[in-house]
Design a protein with these regions (language model features):
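Outer-membrane beta-barrel proteins
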Residues: 2-8, 15, 20-216
């Protein structure tokens, strides 16, 4: 699966997968993006990464594909699902996401995604399997996001089962000249970090990520 949180582009995938809502007519949208560092669920994928995606939504059903440069080939994601939003403001969704790779960067991840949202709060839970180059592993992931009307957001995420680690992400997104801009600070646990201390052991990591994207 690789771990994706590429602000303008990666967050578009996460939000579409977790908080889809019903619409009266079919809609197709496209997106392109660039991030100074590509993070997914607290894990660094690549420094300086470009991405592009396409999404379809009709009457609560959504489907799409998203691809990003991961250095050794491409990450290509496919996802679909169904979401509803009730008069009370509560939203719920269920979907599937597959993460595939054209090179040797990683092996396939496949997962089922569940989402709940109400007001400024959204809760996501995913359960999946990593092919592991012949040694498959099961994992799950839980995240809680709080989004403000001003564009500020905060997310805490927790890996479980055969994966381990947690992270905190706080960011701000805004539009400028028809582009989606973003900045985020990420703190991840030593299990997810790519940083090491003077002793050579993994340490907690920190990163500031800038992004720009365009949707139409």
């Amino acid at each position: 699966m690789k771990r994706l949180t590429q602000l303008a582009a990666g967050l578009a995938l996460a939000s579409s997968a977790l908080v889809a809502s019903t619409s009266a007519s079919a809609e197709v949208s496209y997106n392109i993006g660039y991030a100074s560092e590509y993070y997914f669920r607290g894990v660094l994928q690549k420094n300086s990464s470009a991405s592009a995606g396409i999404d379809y939504e009709a009457d609560g059903f959504y489907a799409g594909s998203w691809a990003a440069d991961v250095g050794d080939g491409l990450e290509v994601d496919g996802y679909f699902g169904y979401g509803i939003e009730m008069d009370s403001g509560l939203s719920a969704s269920i979907g599937y996401t597959g993460y595939f790779y054209t090179g040797e960067f990683d092996d396939t991840y496949q997962e089922i995604n569940f989402g709940l949202g109400y007001g400024m709060f959204s809760l996501g839970y995913s359960v999946g399997e990593w092919d592991g180059f012949g040694a498959s592993e099961d994992y799950d992931f839980l995240d809680l996001t709080i989004t403000g009307e001003s564009g500020l957001y905060g997310t805490v995420g927790f890996w479980g089962d055969e994966f381990d680690g947690e992270y905190l992400e706080v960011g701000y997104g805004f539009s400028f000249a028809d582009f989606d801009m973003g900045i985020a600070g990420i703190i991840n646990s030593e299990e997810l970090s790519d940083e090491v201390g003077s002793s050579g052991r993994p340490t907690t990591g920190e990163a500031i990520v800038f992004s720009i994207g365009k949707s139409w």
